[in-house]
Amino acid sequence: LPIGFCILLLQFDAPVPIAVLTSEPDRHYRIDQGAEMAEQQASASSIVLAEPSLLNLSGFEDALAKGWSPDPRRQQDNIYVEAELAALRYDRAGFLARFTSGDIVATSVSDRAPQRLVIRSFWIWDGEFCGYITFRHLPGTSQLPLHLPGHVGYSIVPWKQGRGYATQALRLLLPIAEQAGFERISVICNEANLASRRVIEKVGGVLYRTGADPSDDPDTIKLFFWLATLSGL
């Protein structure tokens, strides 16, 4: 582990333990288990990242029921939101698996066979569900399938926005990317999305390209940032 980091493992009797990642002023990196611990740490550190489980899926469900779209590209798409809510209620375990298992996809590297996408998804948690953040990558390469806009995806529910949660969550994700072997990751946002741009720049994002991305409408201009992990600083 890099200097300034430590790991603390705590055992709980919860039937399906969750991992909680939290940053503290001394920059320690701590992994706790259990939904109750998540709530305790949230009150002390503003937010934590909690691994999705059947124990905390109800927060995601409640957000969908309020009209939140987990896909930032499909805001105000009520048909999509209702379909997601119906899918969750029909098969909760199957819906949850979408956040923990990646599809087998073709890479953009011509000499590599199709690989399974690695997905690390977390709920953003302050004592209740605030949104999610995901780190996705292909083993052995920093390149991504064309349909994915960068290594990171996130969304904050509207009633939790404006509190700095996205910035904190992105910072908490960097040690996870570092553990996967990345010195830097690609983070993308719409040119018109000033809030997301501020989030990325606050965490140290460096703009390296502006233009369209195959993951979205060709008329939508994107900003492409490199974001260094601790090993890349």
Q: For each predicted feature, which ranges?
A:
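Hydrophobic adenine-recognition pocket in adenosine-nucleotide-binding enzymes
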Residues: 156, 189
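Conserved active-site alpha-helix within GNAT-family acetyltransferase domains
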Residues: 192-209
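Conserved GNAT acetyl-CoA-binding A-motif
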Residues: 179-188
